[in-house]
Regions:
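Basic, glycine-enriched DNA-binding surface that flanks or lies within the catalytic cores of DNA
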Residues: 1-60, 64-65
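Short, well-ordered loop/turn elements at secondary-structure boundaries
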Residues: 31-32, 68-70, 100
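TOPRIM fold recognition
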Residues: 89-199
């Protein structure tokens, strides 16, 4: 697993090993490796520091929990935002992160929002963690247009307002925490109380 890339984005490596695999490929005679995130049709989203693409077919990813069917689904634009969410939950509540309390859908592109509408129909509560831009708002409005009358649709992007996306929010949170710990470490060794990341 290309941990150097995950460290830059402050993604939890163990969570990523569970959710992703490693892809190795050759391009122009050079060998590369990347993170590969599976989708619902057997394809993969592929990412490394220099490359962002997919192994066809392009499709959404639908992560369903085992056991009793969940009535809540969290929806993300890309898998880096999904991994950022898991990391934030794990960091703030390491003993009870509640990662399996809901299902997840990763669009793998806002252009795939239509493909997500049918599976979203089985959920009572939908939380959308889209980018804070026009495309993200359009995707949210499309889901609200389809299900807004009889389902709870939440715009969770308000949590990271001022950031482009959830991954940027994660990076800023961890950088801020490290700066505070560094400053406090000079004066005190007392542990910092966690505020938590509840969604």
């Amino acid at each position: 697993m290309p941990a150097f890339f995950l460290f830059i984005r402050y993604i939890n490596t163990e969570l990523t090993k569970r959710e992703c695999s490693e892809a190795r490929f050759t391009h122009n005679g050079k060998r590369y490796f990347a993170i590969a995130f599976p989708n619902a049709s057997g394809g993969f989203e592929v990412r490394n520091r220099y490359f962002k693409g997919c192994i066809a077919p392009k499709e959404i990813s639908h992560i369903r929990q085992s056991g009793k069917a969940r009535n809540t689904c969290y929806v993300f634009e890309g898998f880096m935002d999904y991994l950022s969410f898991l990391t934030l939950r794990q960091e703030s509540c390491p003993n009870y992160p509640e990662l399996d309390g809901q299902d997840y859908i990763v669009l793998n592109s806002v252009s795939n929002v239509n493909k997500a509408l049918y599976p979203l129909g089985s959920y009572e509560r939908i939380h959308c963690f889209f980018d804070n831009d026009h495309a993200g708002m359009e995707a949210l409005q499309q889901i609200r247009k389809e299900y807004g009358r009889d389902r709870y649709i939440r715009d969770a992007s308000q949590i990271y307002r001022g950031c482009k996306d959830l991954n940027e929010y994660l990076q800023k949170q961890i950088e801020r925490k490290r700066q505070l710990q560094s400053a406090k470490g000079v004066r005190s060794q007392s542990p910092e109380k966690k505020n938590g990341f509840r969604l």
